[in-house]
Structure formats: C-alpha cells, structure tokens
C-alpha cells in the first residue's frame, strides 16, 4: 500500500508539472515529451526502491517483446515511402553487425521510426531496437549509429528492459498476458543513471568490437551537449520557434539520461583505459535522405535559397536523386533562376527516363521563362536522346516552345490533331496549347482553346485559372472574376488565384479590393514581389498591374506612417 501511495504521489506531482507547463506551450506537432517527463521522473524514483525479481526466461522475454512490438506497430501510421524502406534496410544491416557481438544471442530486430520529432532510441524486451528519424538526422557517421544501437542492445543484454516489464507488472498488478497494454513511453524513458552509464560503456565497447570508432559515441554525445544548451534558449523569431519544435521533444530525453558532459568524460576515460586507437569514421550512408527532407522543409516555407543549399548538399552525397533535383528545381524557379531550374528538371528526366508529364511540362516552362528564343532548341536536343516510345506530352511542349520561338506550324497541326482525337487526355493538352498561346500574347486564341478545354474538363483547376488570366487580357474582367469565384478551394493554386483576382479588380478600377487580394497573394507566394519572376511567367499587362499595386500599397503605407507621426 505504501508503494502505491508513493507511486500515486509521484504521478500526481508529474501531472501537476505538465499542467503548469501548458501555459507556455506553442502549437506544435503531437509529441510524447510531456508524458516522457512524467514517466522518466517516475521511473527514476521507482528504480531507487529495493525490489527484486526472479529473472524471466529468454523465451518468455522474447514473447512479451514481440507482443509489445506488434501492438506498437498497430498503433502507428504506416509510412511506405521508398526512403523509409531504404533507412529500415540500412538500420537493420548496421544493427545486425553490432548484434553479432552481443552477449545474449537473441533474435534482434531493428525498427525505424520515421518522425523528425522523435529524437530518441529505445529497446523492448527480447531484442527489438527502435531508432527515431530525429535522432538519425543529427548523425554524421555510421559510427554514431553503431554506438546508439550498441547502447540499446546493452539495455536488453543487461535485462534492463525485462526488469522494467516485471516492475510495471508488479505496480499495475497485471498478468503477463496483459502487458501488451503497457504504454510504449515507459521504454522510451531512460533508466537509472548507473544503468545508462553502463549501457554507454558496454555499448561503445560493442561498437568498437564490431569495427567502429569509439569517437562515434563521443560525437553523438557532443551533439546532445550542443542541443542541451540550445533547447533551453528562448525563440526570438518565428523561424526559431519552428526549429524548437523538435528540440522540445528533447526535454524528456535530457530529464531521463545523464548529462552529455558526464557521458563524454566516461567514454574518453574508457578509450584511454582500453588503449583503443583512433579509427576513421564511416559516412552515414542514408544521410542524403535527411538532407533532402531538410531541403523539402525549407522549400515548404518558401526559403528558396536555403532549400537550394540543402538540396545541393544532398546531391553531393548522392547525385542520382530525382526528389532532391525536384526540390532544387523548384527552389531555383522560386528565385527566378529559370535556366538553373531547367537544368535540374532535365537531370530528373535523364535519371528516370520514363514518362513524367508534369516534369516534362515544368522543364518546358522553365526553358520558356529562361529564354523564349532558344528554349525549343535545347528541348529538341533532349528529345533526341529519349529512348523508346516518346510520350505525347513531348509533342505538346515542343510545339509550345516552337510557337514562342516564332514557328506556329507545329502548334497549328497539333491543335487540329487533338480536336479530332478521341483520347480522354486531349482536352487537357488543348488547354496546355491555350496557355502557350497566352505566353505568345495571342490572348483571344488562348481564350478560345482554354474555354473549349474547360468545358470538357471542368474539374481541371489549373486550366480554369489559366482561362481567367486569358479573360483578363481580353478585358472580360467580370467573367474572369466569376471563373475565379466558382473555382473550388485548392491550396496549391490559392496564391495565384488571389493574384488573378487582384489584377482583375485593379484593371476594373476596384483598387481597394485589389489590394486586399494582393495581400492574400503575397502571404502565400512572395515571388510576386520579384518583378523578374512575374515578367517571365505572365503577360506584360499582368506584370505592370502587379508593379502598380505594389507601388500603391507602399504609397498607402507611407501615407499612414506620416499620419501616425503627426
């Protein structure tokens, strides 16, 4: 009874601390951090209590571990992307190498948790080891991963995981068959300080026996030390607030593990006492995946220069990545580096020589924005090297580029062919031809083709948006605004739709409404303030209207500032 009273007191104290911390909470993705505070503190208190157990058999431990792992897998969303499969295979390969030197010969299994917010690793009884994406993302070498895996294997080797199960069974008065209901957080939380330091020592030794450098453990702990200092600092900007999302999940980790400085000192002492010589560390073979993910995250918040830098870093590690090249292309396009974007799109098409209509269209668009006169020449050079059957999309893009270069014959022939075609994709291609006519300043022809295409494919939102731009050019502002009003919501085109409304309202002399629409467009797509970007992609009238609206917005701001200071 006293034990239960003490346990309840600790839990209530933990809950109280979590409730108090809620006052300073920011809106972040769901995290186990708060529960980890509670579990970690509670577990550390309970491990100080004198409790002895009869050690369970290996077979029983393996069975319980398998049941817990199965329950954990069932409660998680499955991520079946190729990148997750690659990391899983890599983690298993490194883990199996390290596990060969483990004292207990258990059926070790290694699992990747693909979340950037899970900056931890943990083990389940019987041989299951989990490593989070957030932790892997912090690593520079395979030796660091080997040290982390060795640490978790040693928690299994020393029966720390099994004893935790027995402790929870006693506290909760559960039959062994009911242990599957245990929250996984009790294993994510750390063990006692002595157990953690022992796992550090023996885990490092395990990694060294496998052929890895002991410096991997030190490097990992040095990263923890840096983050330990950073996670307590207060964010001063929205960007820093965003970067602290993952760091906040570290708080549970630091509360449940020895200080990084203490762990570093212990490993350094171990290296000296064992006389281990320095070994070169191996590159983390999957690091490129995390660099690409960082690049994508920067692209998502329209930090184009940073996204380009990160994508280039990823491609240095692994040059044959279509995903990294796509991030690079979009980042360059967002900065109005259209020739650079075209180069990246071409790399994608060269790496994966299959039909990618959206990449072909983006490649052609980048070429057109870069240089209308020479775009078709470069495109045709690439087409000549395409092996096998050439997708119809190539002909559409080539005809459009030829039109911009002054040759209207290919697009004229293609238009006749498509209007006679029964292919279900024909209306979409006719709509693409309509947009090429818009870029060539033949606005009435653009309206005619796009109207025909939209009538046949009313659900094509981008096509409807293109029609609105063309309607603006022929002074049909009301029709353009109605088209934009009727379009369903799609976050991918909301900014462009807002700018089309702004231009239509501006030209219709509805300036106040135009400036409201301008604000909405800029909030979602800051590229609109780049005159080079706008001029390359839209009509001279649209580009001029955007510049006039930006100037009027600045004039009104200046007027407001002057009025405020009086």
Language model feature labels by segment:
Residues 531-536:
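Acidic, Ser/Thr-rich low-complexity linear motifs
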Residues 2-455, 459-469, 475-502, 508, ...:
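A Zn2+-metalloprotease active-site environment signal
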């Amino acid at each position: 009874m006293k034990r239960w009273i003490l346990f309840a007191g600790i839990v209530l104290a933990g809950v109280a601390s979590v409730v108090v911390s809620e006052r300073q909470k920011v809106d972040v993705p769901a995290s186990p951090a708060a529960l980890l505070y509670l579990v970690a503190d509670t577990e550390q208190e309970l491990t100080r209590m004198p409790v002895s157990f009869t050690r369970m058999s290996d077979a029983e431990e393996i069975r319980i571990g398998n049941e817990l792992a199965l329950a954990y897998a069932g409660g998680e969303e499955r991520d079946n992307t190729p990148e997750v499969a690659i990391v899983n295979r890599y983690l298993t390969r490194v883990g199996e190498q390290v596990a060969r030197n483990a004292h207990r010969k258990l059926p070790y299994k290694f699992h990747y948790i693909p979340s950037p917010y899970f900056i931890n690793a943990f083990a389940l009884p019987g041989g299951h080891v989990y490593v989070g994406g957030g932790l892997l993302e912090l690593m520079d070498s395979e030796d660091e991963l080997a040290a982390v895996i060795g640490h978790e294997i040693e928690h299994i080797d020393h029966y720390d995981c099994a004893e935790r199960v027995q402790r929870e069974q006693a506290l909760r008065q559960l039959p062994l068959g009911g242990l599957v209901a245990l929250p996984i957080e009790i294993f994510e939380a750390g063990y006692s300080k002595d157990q953690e330091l022992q796992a550090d020592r023996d885990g490092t030794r395990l990694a060294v026996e496998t052929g890895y450098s002991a410096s991997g453990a030190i490097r990992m702990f040095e990263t923890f030390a840096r983050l330990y200092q950073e996670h307590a600092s207060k964010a001063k900007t929205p960007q820093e607030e965003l970067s602290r999302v993952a760091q906040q999940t570290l708080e549970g980790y630091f509360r449940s593990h020895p200080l990084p400085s203490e762990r570093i000192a212990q490993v350094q002492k171990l290296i000296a006492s064992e006389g281990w010589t320095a070994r070169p560390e191996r590159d983390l073979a999957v690091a490129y995946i995390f660099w690409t993910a960082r690049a994508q995250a920067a692209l998502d918040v329209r930090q184009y220069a940073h996204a380009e830098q990160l994508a280039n870093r990823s491609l240095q590690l692994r040059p044959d990545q279509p995903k990294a090249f796509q991030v690079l292309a979009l980042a360059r396009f967002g900065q109005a580096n259209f020739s650079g974007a075209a180069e990246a799109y071409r790399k994608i098409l060269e790496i994966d020589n299959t039909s990618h209509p959206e990449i072909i269209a983006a490649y052609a668009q980048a070429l057109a924005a870069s240089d209308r006169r020479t775009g078709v020449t470069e495109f045709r050079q690439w087409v000549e090297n395409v092996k096998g059957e050439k997708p119809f999309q190539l002909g559409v893009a080539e005809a459009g580029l030829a039109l911009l270069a002054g040759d209207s014959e290919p697009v004229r022939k293609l238009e006749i062919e498509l209007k006679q075609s029964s292919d279900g994709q024909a209306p979409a291609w006719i709509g693409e031809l309509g947009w090429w006519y818009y870029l060539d300043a033949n606005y009435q022809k653009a309206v005619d083709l796009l109207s025909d295409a939209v009538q046949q494919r009313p659900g094509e939102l981008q096509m409807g948006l293109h029609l609105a731009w063309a309607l603006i050019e022929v002074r049909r502002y009301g029709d353009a605004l109605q088209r934009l009003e009727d379009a369903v919501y799609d976050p991918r085109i909301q900014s462009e739709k807002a700018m089309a409304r702004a231009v239509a309202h501006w030209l219709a002399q509805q300036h106040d409404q135009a400036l409201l629409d301008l604000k909405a467009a800029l909030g979602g797509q800051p590229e609109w303030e780049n005159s080079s970007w706008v001029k390359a992609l839209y009509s001279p009238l649209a580009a001029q209207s955007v510049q006039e609206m930006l100037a009027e917005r600045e004039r009104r701001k200046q007027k407001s500032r002057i009025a405020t200071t009086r």
